[in-house]
Amino acid sequence: MATHLFDLTGKIALVTGASRGIGEEIAKLLAEQGAHVIVSSRKIEDCQRVANEIIAANGKAEAFACHVGKLEDIAEIFEYIRKEHGRLDILVNNAAANPYFGHILDTDIGAYNKTVEVNIRGYFFMSIEAGKLMKEQGSGAIVNTASVNALQPGDRQGIYSITKAAVVNMTKAFAKECGPLGIRMNALLPGLTKTKFASALFENEDIYKSWMDTIPLRRHAEPREMAGTVLYLVSDAASYTNGECIVVDGGLTI
């Protein structure tokens, strides 16, 4: 049974990028604590799988496909939320794009646009639409998934690192302007986590070893280890936490 501080019973939560990895674990943990979770990602069948697993575990969930890089998709999902639920208590911006892994000088315009459209523009306009609903109800919590690359740019991850640094400042800007409206925004900065999204780092032995040599815990994280921080940030336990960017990296950035 959920404890009082972390109880999300009756809350409506939207988690993007929730069909796998960190997003999937966030969606499942929020549901375990009582939230009704809207599982969102680009492919409806992947979202439905996660929603079905939540429901099978006696949780509340539904699937809704949304490509956050497309403004029309953002408008559609929030029209649905407003019509079907009339409120949104929690938004977790977790969808991300990292199409290019290589030297920064070789970044092409296609990779640049795709990364910026999802990681910056997508987060920005998802937050605006969520913020409008939350302003009406006088409360809400938004969490952005950034990255330790926002603090220490990753080798051969230039444009991705740049967008995640933007997410950190976006978090602080929204927190400052929306705090008076009862809306909190914080960010999670994961370290090296075993996901399909980060597969390029695990497949390159030299890069993986360089990470292991610099992480004091001498291991990578599992997706579930990121979800707990998000639960804290969206719960009453963090009711006075606003504009914070919490690093969960095994000590990498010490």
What are these regions (language model features)?
Residues 102-104, 108-113, 211:
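Substrate-binding pocket helix/loop in short-chain dehydrogenase/reductase
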Residues 124, 219-248, 253:
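C-terminal substrate-recognition "lid" of short-chain dehydrogenase/reductases
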Residues 147:
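Residue(s) in the substrate-gating loop at a strand-loop-helix junction
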Residues 12, 19-20:
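Conserved glycine-rich cofactor-binding loop
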Residues 179, 184, 241-243:
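Short, small/polar-rich loop/turn modules that mediate ligand/substrate recognition or access, typified
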Residues 44, 65-77, 109:
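The beta1-alpha1 cofactor-binding region of Rossmann-like NAD(H)/NADP(H)-dependent oxidoreductases
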Residues 127, 163, 171:
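Active-site helix of classical SDR
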